[in-house]
Amino acid sequence: LDHKRIGIIYSIMGLWGGLMGLSLSFLLRLNFTDPYYNLIGPEVYNYIITGHGLAMIFFFLMPVIIGGFGNFLLPLLLGMPDLSLPRLNALSAWLMLPSVVCFGISLFIGSGVGWTFYPPLSSIPYTGVGVDYLMFSLHLAGLSSILGSLNFITTIFSSIFSQLSSRISIIIWAYLFTSILLISSLPVLAAAITMLLFDRNFGSSFFDPMGGGD
């Protein structure tokens, strides 16, 4: 697959995730229409808040803006036929599909954890597999973003070394610094989610003060 087709795949995945987030947003606003009658239960409401935020960030904005537009714009602005690592680019694109599927499955299983994955709230009251599906979905989305960022950084640096850096467009620098920030921050989120998964399923105490965790 060339970069244009992969950009289309990213855009389709992003639009799909955006529609999921939009439907969750409609449910939230529908719940606010009558202050004396709650259409949605409190636990499901918490999960919809969590799912809405994650869908808009990880499954709409990042695939469309970074994956979709990036795959179209970077080779065009750099004067290259494709990105430096096309197979890695295809792998990062196809990882979005199981990520979105796991997110969709988690919508119908269990309840959510509110605005954030606050570890005590995620471990004790919410013991269903819905939170685990959502964390696995975040793992896949983060892995896809890291692989795509590595591809962008490799492509941009190989182009910078072959031509004057003053001729590089500012949007290329924006993609470069965004990719560096993603590679720096996403492993921290992945480590925290992994520790939380171990606390929930394997009896560890990374986040449990009673067991020596912090």
Pin down the residues of each PLM region.
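Membrane-embedded and interfacial regions of multi-pass energy-transducing membrane proteins
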Residues: 1-214
